[in-house]
Structure formats: structure tokens, C-alpha cells
């Protein structure tokens, strides 16, 4: 749908079926300041560890997981070394759906981690 509105040249898609040899090319193109890409669409688990998206200014969650660490890893991808932008995070959640329950559960998990591990629980997580 994004491609219909903004055109194919402005959207990069990166999913599980994306061939390994294309993945770094897609990420590098998105990171290039001269790139016409305005959107990077992917799934949190697809990139594996180490993917960097410091060109991002907005992260939109449209598919959520009960695993808090998967979400935090997604946020880290936009906050690696080289990030110069303020990053906004948006949850797309339909009322009375499982996503609404997932978001509530993530909030409770984050709150509990803060109580158990201290002010910055992420320092304890590996």
C-alpha cells in the first residue's frame, strides 16, 4: 500500500524471503543520504542481529510480539552509532484485538523489569 501512494522508488522491503545477498544492499541504500528511499519495511526478527538503521526517523510497529527483547532490539537498530535524528515510535493497534493485549503485556513486562532490575533494566539484559 505504501508503494501505491509513494511509488516503488521510495520503499525498501526486507522480509524473511529476501535473499541474503540482497539484504545488505537494501540496508546500505536506505542508509545512503542521497537515497530516494523514504520507507524501510521489515519484520523485527528478519534482520537478525547487527542490522543498523540509523537513517530512520520513525519506527512503526504494525505487527507485535509478546517478547519485550524483540521490540527493544528493533528500537536499538535505529539508535546505533551514527544516529543523528530524533526517532519517533508508533504502535498501530486495532481496538479489541490481540495486538491490544500484546501492547498491554509489553508495558507490564517493562514495568516489572524496571522494578526488579532497577532504573535501567537494559543494562542487565544480554
Predicted region positions:
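Conserved helicase ATPase core of P-loop NTP-dependent helicases/translocases
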Residues: 6-47
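Hydrophobic residues at beta-strand termini and immediately following loops
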Residues: 14, 62, 92
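Conserved RecA-like P-loop NTPase ATPase core
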Residues: 30, 53, 106
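A conserved SF2-helicase RecA2
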Residues: 66-126
Amino acid at each position: 500500500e505504501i508503494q501505491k501512494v509513494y511509488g516503488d522508488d521510495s520503499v525498501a522491503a526486507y522480509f524473511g524471503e529476501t535473499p541474503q545477498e540482497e539484504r545488505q544492499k537494501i540496508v546500505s541504500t536506505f542508509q545512503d543520504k542521497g537515497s530516494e528511499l523514504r520507507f524501510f519495511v521489515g519484520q523485527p526478527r528478519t534482520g537478525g542481529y547487527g542490522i543498523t538503521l540509523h537513517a530512520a526517523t520513525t519506527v512503526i510497529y504494525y505487527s507485535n510480539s509478546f517478547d519485550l527483547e524483540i521490540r527493544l532490539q528493533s528500537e536499538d537498530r535505529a539508535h546505533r552509532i551514527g544516529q543523528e535524528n530524533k526517532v519517533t515510535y508508533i504502535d498501530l493497534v486495532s481496538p479489541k484485538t490481540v495486538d491490544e493485549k500484546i501492547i498491554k503485556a509489553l508495558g507490564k513486562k517493562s514495568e516489572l523489569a524496571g522494578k526488579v532490575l532497577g532504573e535501567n533494566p537494559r543494562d542487565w539484559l544480554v
